[in-house]
């Protein structure tokens, strides 16, 4: 019923369950194939409680630039209630992101990510989207994508003062280190009507 639904939350193909007995029941159902092909692989992870944000990096194969961070709002209902969506709106800059946390993200996540791509000889130029969660002022990665996030792209690119074609040309030519990015310091927000 509703009580059970409140205790577990399905995020796309994930379940977040806060009671051991319910977790055992769901795991048993998965292992018995209740969810078809999706049940063939089950991953159990630590639950991280914090606030999410999105980090966007443009990487040219050698150099990288960090774009403005954004915070999206996934829940469909008012006051952050209801089921998760791809995003019902976003804001940039992120109100709770200070210089110290940004530096931790760059040192612990962005630099090792870029170095890993280089060390693995992965031929990649483009966007790196890093979904993060801030847990007591410590950043944790919850997902990577090689694209911009939606709806965050709308607020992030609105803040970029540079000509976007010039930025992408520098990315293609591996000259991101030769361009200074300029960002509007105003707050941008968007709302998805669904």
Show where each model-derived region lies:
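Single conserved hydrophobic/aromatic residue that forms the stacking wall/gate
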Residues: 1-7, 11
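Solvent-exposed alpha-helices and their adjacent loops that cap or buttress functional pockets
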Residues: 8, 33-39, 46-50, 57-61, ...
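Generic preference for hydrophobic
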Residues: 9-10, 44, 66, 191
């Amino acid at each position: 019923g509703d009580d059970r639904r409140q205790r577990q939350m399905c995020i796309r193909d994930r379940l977040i369950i806060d009671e051991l007995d319910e977790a055992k029941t769901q795991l048993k159902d998965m292992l018995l194939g209740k969810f078809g092909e999706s049940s063939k692989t089950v991953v159990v992870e630590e639950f991280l409680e914090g606030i999410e944000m999105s980090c966007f990096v443009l990487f040219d194969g050698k150099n990288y630039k960090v774009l403005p961070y954004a915070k999206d709002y996934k829940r469909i209902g008012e006051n952050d209630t209801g089921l998760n969506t791809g995003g019902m709106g976003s804001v940039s800059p992120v109100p709770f992101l200070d210089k110290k946390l940004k530096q931790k993200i760059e040192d612990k996540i962005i630099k090792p990510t870029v170095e890993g791509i280089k060390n693995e000889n992965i031929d990649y130029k483009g966007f790196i989207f890093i979904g993060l969660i801030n847990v007591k002022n410590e950043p944790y990665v919850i997902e990577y994508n090689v694209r911009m996030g939606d709806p965050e792209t709308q607020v992030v690119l609105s803040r970029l003062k540079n000509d976007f074609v010039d930025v992408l040309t520098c990315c293609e030519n591996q000259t991101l280190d030769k361009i200074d990015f300029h960002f509007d310091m105003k707050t941008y927000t968007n709302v998805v009507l669904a």
